């Protein structure tokens, strides 16, 4: 009995030693793994062995391929006098431009501004019911700065509802309202940059209501410190050929 008991105690000590070693290994591994993980603002992050933090949920920033002039062969530009200027100075021969002076977002559905080529004039919705486009650009807002914001957005939403129904496969871009010059903004109670900013913010919110409508911040391509530079044009509102090309380049890089 004594010899068996000694063997039993010896085996028991050996077993306890093995268990202790296993627990130690697990503990060391847990510490090492813990050093690779941390919480940042409530989000779990992984620290690679090199020591740089990297979010496990981080998604890459959106990237765009620069499009060439051929992209605009199936594009339509609709808008007011600023859109008309862009169409005139852009040197893009292939896109269709339906824009004219004094056209506003409430008038665009009913105004017959599209020449069919046979002498017949039709509305933009009539044309969209006959011709499919890959992309449609809309530019309104300068002439509507004196309106209540709610009136402007209601009319814009009505037009977007019509276009998205007629062209469900098209990418539709709502172009931001360009700022005016610092001098005009400081002197005019209607055409001023605080009003432009309010309307642009409302347009961004409107675009979020649609799956295939995107807000295109073309203002950032020409504005300097939030205003239209003095050398852009003569009236503080419209722009010249040089700045038309800046806008086109921005579009090519952001669609």
Question: How would you describe each model-predicted region?
Answer:
Residues 139, 143, 164-196:
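Active-site segments of SGNH/GDSL-like serine hydrolases
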Residues 34-74:
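N-terminal, intrinsically disordered, polar/charged segments of Gram-positive cell-envelope systems
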Residues 151-159, 193-196:
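Charged helix-capping and loop-helix junction motifs
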Residues 31, 180-255:
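Catalytic His-Asp segment of secreted/periplasmic serine-dependent ester chemistry enzymes
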Residues 71-74, 131-136, 167-172, 210-214:
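Loop/turn elements at helix/coil->beta-strand transitions in domains of secreted/extracellular proteins
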Residues 65-155:
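Conserved SGNH/GDSL esterase-like catalytic core that processes O-acyl groups on lipids
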Residues 17-31:
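Hydrophobic membrane-insertion alpha-helices, especially the h-region
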Residues 1-13:
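N-terminal Lys/Arg-rich, disordered targeting/topogenic segments
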